[in-house]
Every structure is written in C-alpha cells, then in structure tokens.
Amino acid sequence: MSERNTLFSRPLPIALFILVALVADQAIKYLVEAFLPFQEAVPVVPMLALYRTYNYGVAFSMLSGMEGWFIVGMRLAVVAFVLWLWRRTPKDRFFAHLGYAMIIAGALGNLVDRLLFGYVIDYILFHTATWSFAVFNLADSFITVGAGAIILDELLQTKKTRSLKL
C-alpha cells in the first residue's frame, strides 16, 4: 500500500507556507514597533490587549539571562530537528506535516527578531483584572498551534492503528 502525499509533505508547499507565515509575522512586528507604545496596554476587546514588550529569552522569557548566540544556536537546532522529523514522517500524515511547517515558521520568525534586534518582539496580552498570561506574538502562536496539530495527528494515528487491529 503506497502513502498518499499530503500538501505539506512536499517541499514547495511547505516552503511557501513557511515564507508566507514568516512574512506575516515580520510585517505585524514591524507595525507593532512603528505604532504601539512600549509596555503600555492598548485594549482590543475584554481580556485582550496589545502590549509591546521585548523578550530576551525564549518562551515565557525563560533563559533570558543566557547569551544571545546560545539561544540562536538552540533555535537553529530546533529547526533542524523539526526538518528531520518532517522528512521521516510518512507522507499521509497531514496534521503532523502542517504542525512541522508551523513550528518551523514560528521558530524562524522569532530567530529573525533575535538576529536583528537581540530580542523578540511580543505584543499579544490575554488578561483579567487579577491575572495576565505571558505576552506573546504570532510566531509563538504558530509554534503552539503546530505542536497541537502534531499531537492531534498522533491521536488520530493511534485511533487509526487501533481500528486496523480490530
């Protein structure tokens, strides 16, 4: 039985997706830098504000005390590892391939910031009157949704494998 190629199992569609996602991420960050005040909440809807800040670490400002080149190297290693996973994953696993593309796009989006500025531009803030979530950006969202797509793919694959055994 041969594998059915999915859209993101082929190099050109995945490269185009990553490029479009990267351009969108950088364009939004450019607008954030140009028009949002620094560390001042701009309410959008209840519980959501735009809030420009800089992240010198990785997710949730972890490793913010580490040398910038260490973080750049770590991000490049993540991209290389995800590319390796993408190449080894069966071609019919749509959500896994979509997830890999999203993770690569997000990692590259934040890597561009790190290389250009020495920090990552964050600007999305979820909050209530007594609590607020970490400030993040579109690239972070790509990484999170991409990881979710891979988990979904694994769950679907497990269900498919179980039904084949019955």
Swiss-Prot record:
InterPro entries (alphabetical): Peptidase_A8
Gene: lspA
Subcellular location, principal: membrane
Topology relative to the membrane: Multi-pass membrane protein
NCBIfam families: lspA
GO biological process: proteolysis
UniProt-recorded Gene Ontology molecular function terms: aspartic-type endopeptidase activity
PANTHER family in UniProt: LIPOPROTEIN SIGNAL PEPTIDASE
Name of the protein in question: Lipoprotein signal peptidase
Active site: D122, D140
Pfam family, one: Peptidase_A8
